[in-house]
Amino acid sequence: MPDYVISVVTNALNDLGKAVKGSRILILGLAYKANVDDCRESPSFVLMEKLLAKGAEVDYNDPFVPVIPKTREYADMAGKKSVEIDDSFDLILLSTDHEKYKSFDFSDYPCPVVDTRNCIKHKPQSYYKA
């Protein structure tokens, strides 16, 4: 599943004439499931790792996980802080379907949004399901 999501992200960026390498990507949701702060075994970590390995600059936003806790598997990510959602990113990747994201208005966002949960109500022009 993570490899498929990465391929959709790659295609979305390619549609803009951009490569993954050097692109700024925002992952929405670090928690394992919606509206909780438990990020153990979250697929978002795998997505972050794969995107970083491809040379992307990756940040995340999660209202329930303001700072990445120390874990054995992802110790190098510990302490990274959640950032605000804004239009400075090349791509937004929704990984966890928090209520905040379902109702967030992405319709005016200039960058593509890849939705792995098929939950965004106010979609941008450049919208991809993964």
Ranges and model annotations:
Residues 1-130:
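Structural/interface elements that position substrates and couple domains in central-metabolism enzymes
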